[in-house]
């Protein structure tokens, strides 16, 4: 038997943190149904869809709990009845969406509002519900969205797994064959004290050759038949490895899911954006120039004659994608210095959040 039939938990969740999760669990434990409503402004740095996804991941399987998000671009003014009603209009609309999803539009009303904020009393009053304060002094979880935005790295331990994966600053090193991507990415991970994610494409190639030899023991690298599915598999597995490796605020990757689209172009002879349509947008791409780097044949490489073309393909693709990137050139030491400088700037920029509407 629960205390309430339908509870509302409403906030920006910008970003979701341990205090938010404590609040949601408290509401769900005492309510038959719980609607978590994420209201985000378009001026804010984290899209509402991301916040909703992170909350859903953390609270998956909670009976009666639904997380919904919507846009609320109204200014905040707790002294204005008119402004209050603008926000409440959005909140009621989201509660209506929940009721429609449940197949019972008449069940939209709530009988409890769970919150840790001072506006909880007024919100509950306007909804004809009871306000249930949860840790308003933040003694159980001494964290706030403001604190996380001000210094995400210092508050990293207050973030759930899905939020960490989504917020992590990813540094991705890409480049043509034998241009030092693996060496540079390893060096960066060591210098930054960050996890390192190896390239999956090589492992897939080795496995593909082994599979081909199950049909023809004499099969060689040059005779492999590459398909779109191969590169979709590479992109998917590269993303899985990357997400699994996230622990701290920074991650260094030797290639990523998007890079698989460039290699698909190289082996299939045409652009294939469908290889990785939902690839992450890293904090920074580093493109290793082929100029000045001798080609080293390790038995698995076949693109010495295409290195300049591949460098241009990466350069064009990165520019078109509109992501932060930098070409690193010169000696190994020069490349490392350039990369470290670019990483410092990129990580600082990545963790700079727009202020919420006040």
Where are these regions (language model features)?
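Glycine-rich phosphate-binding P-loop
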Residues: 171-189
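Glycine-rich phosphate-binding loop used to anchor ATP phosphates in small-molecule kinases
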Residues: 230-280, 295
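A glycine- and Lys/Arg-enriched "phosphate-lid" helix/loop adjacent to the NTP-binding pocket
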Residues: 148, 268-334, 347, 356-357
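Conserved substrate/cofactor phosphate-moiety recognition/catalytic segment
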Residues: 186, 190-243, 339
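Short loop/turn segments at strand-loop or loop-helix junctions that form parts
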Residues: 38-39, 69-73, 199-201, 255-257, ...
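A structural motif corresponding to the C-terminal end of an alpha-helix
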Residues: 62, 108, 127-128, 246-248, ...
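Nucleotidyltransferase catalytic core that binds NTPs
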Residues: 1-169
């Amino acid at each position: 038997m629960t205390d309430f039939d339908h509870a509302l938990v409403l906030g920006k969740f910008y970003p979701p943190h341990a205090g938010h999760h404590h609040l949601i669990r408290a509401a769900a434990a005492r309510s038959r149904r719980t609607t978590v409503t994420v209201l985000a402004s378009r001026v804010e740095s984290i899209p509402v869809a991301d916040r909703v996804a992170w909350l859903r991941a953390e609270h998956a399987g909670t009976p009666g709990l639904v997380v919904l998000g919507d846009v609320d671009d109204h200014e905040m003014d707790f002294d204005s009845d008119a402004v209050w009603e603008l926000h409440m209009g959005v909140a009621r609309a989201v509660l209506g969406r929940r009721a429609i999803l449940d197949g019972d539009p008449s069940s939209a009303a709530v009988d409890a509002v769970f919150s840790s904020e001072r506006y909880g009393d007024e919100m509950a009053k306007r909804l004809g519900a009871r306000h249930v304060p949860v840790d308003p002094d933040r003694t159980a979880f001494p964290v706030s969205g403001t604190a996380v935005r001000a210094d995400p790295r210092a508050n990293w331990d207050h973030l759930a797994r899905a939020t960490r994966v989504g917020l992590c600053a990813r540094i991705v090193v890409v480049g043509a064959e034998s241009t030092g991507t693996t060496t540079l990415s390893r060096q960066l991970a060591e210098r930054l004290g960050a996890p390192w994610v190896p390239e999956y494409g090589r492992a897939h190639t080795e496995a593909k050759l082994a599979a081909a030899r199950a049909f023809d023991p004499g099969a060689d690298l040059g005779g492999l038949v590459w398909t779109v599915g191969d590169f979709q598999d590479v992109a998917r597995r590269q993303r899985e490895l990357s997400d699994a490796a996230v622990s701290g605020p920074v991650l260094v990757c030797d290639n990523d899911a998007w890079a698989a689209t460039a290699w698909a172009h190289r082996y299939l002879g045409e652009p294939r954006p469908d290889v990785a349509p939902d690839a992450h947008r890293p904090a920074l791409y580093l493109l290793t120039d082929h100029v000045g780097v001798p080609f080293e044949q390790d038995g698995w490489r076949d693109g010495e004659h295409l290195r300049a073309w591949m460098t241009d393909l990466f350069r064009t693709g990165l520019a078109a994608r509109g992501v932060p990137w930098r070409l690193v050139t010169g000696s190994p030491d020069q490349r490392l210095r350039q990369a470290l400088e670019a990483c410092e700037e990129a990580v600082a920029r990545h963790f700079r959040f727009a202020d919420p509407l006040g």
